Amino acid sequence: MPVTIKDVAKAAGVSPSTVTRVIQNKSTISDETKKRVRKAMKELNYHPNLNARSLVSSYTQVIGLVLPDDSDAFYQNPFFPSVLRGISQVASENHYAIQIATGKDEKERLNAISQMVYGKRVDGLIFLYAQEEDPLVKLVAEEQFPFLILGKSLSPFIPLVDNDNVQAGFDATEYFIKKGCKRIAFIGGSKKLFVTKDRLTGYEQALKHYKLTTDNNRIYFADEFLEEKGYKFSKRLFKHDPQIDAIITTDSLLAEGVCNYIAKHQLDVPVLSFDSVNPKLNLAAYVDINSLELGRVSLETILQIINDNKNNKQICYRQLIAHKIIEK
């Protein structure tokens, strides 16, 4: 016979209604009781009916993840699997499922999000990128639907989880300056992304602080995070200035292209990158932005926002995750 809520309640020493409230993740149930009920569910191999549960609670127990425009680069980039792992860990701990919103262009992604929001297919959204004047974020904010951004926002009313990317850019540049480098190049992602702008700002601030010249011919931006872009811009950099003595990239895929160019031309130029990196890359160091923790805190925060929404609370959460430079 299939296991029922009554069986779980008996095993956990609570009432069936308490089991139902635990399944609905109600804030009125203590963490200790939730833990006991979930342990009983696991031991009895009980799986609640998601559709029936959503009809009763009006909540789906699903979180939507909004991908950036370039989804191909998303799946190639080691940063995102690490973030997703953190998100999935917390989702699993809280009995939530994940649904991804993507599309080949902005119109398709807007349509996917509209279906999620107006169709009540998810309880909240996490945007896995941050850029200025995003119509997708505007739609969700206007509908007062629970969401947060993994990244930066200029609006003080948008919840977010991020690193201090200005400081991270400064620290990365300072690392090379303290090694004696003076002609440091910067290869970043799209200029419309806050993360690129902030890391560039930190780079420029460090050069200014140490009284080094900022040369715009040593700065390049890639519209896509792809290995070939890193290779292409490395070629341009060394053509302009063969004396470049260090390169900072804001992404591990760009770093791969840079390292390939340097290896092919037998150059002795150190490279530093951000995010999770391929251990095979010959980097001098990388900035560990703690992408796993970014994912975990993002999911924990959106669940708190959803819970606040249930209780008619309005709190704008803005959390920063620490970074550190790791030498290889």
UniProtKB/Swiss-Prot annotation:
Domain of life of the source: Bacteria
SUPFAM superfamilies named in the record: lambda repressor-like DNA-binding domains, Periplasmic binding protein-like I
Taxonomic path: Bacteria, Bacillati, Bacillota, Bacilli, Lactobacillales
DNA-binding region: 5-24
Residue ranges of the TM segments: none
Chain residue ranges for the region called Inducer binding: 173-218
Name the UniProt record assigns to this protein: HTH-type transcriptional regulator MalR
Gene name as annotated: malR
InterPro entries documented for this protein: Cro/C1-type_HTH, HTH_LacI, Lambda_DNA-bd_dom_sf, Peripla_BP/Lac1_sug-bd_dom, Peripla_BP_I
